[in-house]
Amino acid sequence: MMVLDKEDGVPMLSVQPKGKQKGCAGCNRKIKDRYLLKALDKYWHEDCLKCACCDCRLGEVGSTLYTKANLILCRRDYLRLFGTTGNCAACSKLIPAFEMVMRARDNVYHLDCFACQLCNQRFCVGDKFFLKNNMILCQMDYEEGQLNGTFESQVQ
């Protein structure tokens, strides 16, 4: 049985070592169960791990929880509170709040859309890219444009 935290993708279920009972973050009582639920670096009884808005139980098998702003939320309340992250600067389509994104200055992109706008080379976290007139460019296309006098430096 494995329950995952959607924000971090880390397992929320672990076996409690014998003799060292953890305290529940919800009720402050010792957790005597064999398995521990962990969310926001705290331990919970199955009945105590609930959505901060609607109080629905999130400790059951198959449940999914979301964390943001130190809140533990069910999917419905997460989407209701945090909605969307806006529109993708490349394709203009809506980006759901729970989707991973790439950011460049004030622009937000789907992971699949975060690419050089001239050659379509995709970027990963840590890759060097250049931003000119809200256009994302790879190093090769940027340097070529700079040699031609097309672009001035705005390294990210």
UniProtKB/Swiss-Prot annotation:
Expressed mainly in the central nervous. Low level of expression in other tissues including thymus. Keywords: Chromosomal rearrangement, LIM domain, Metal-binding, Nucleus, Proto-oncogene, Repeat, Zinc. Signal peptide: none annotated. One of its GO terms (molecular function) is metal ion binding. It is found in: Nucleus. It is linked to A chromosomal aberration involving LMO1 may be a cause of a form of T-cell acute lymphoblastic leukemia (T-ALL). Translocation t(11,14)(p15;q11) with TCRD. This is Rhombotin-1. It comes from Homo sapiens (Human).
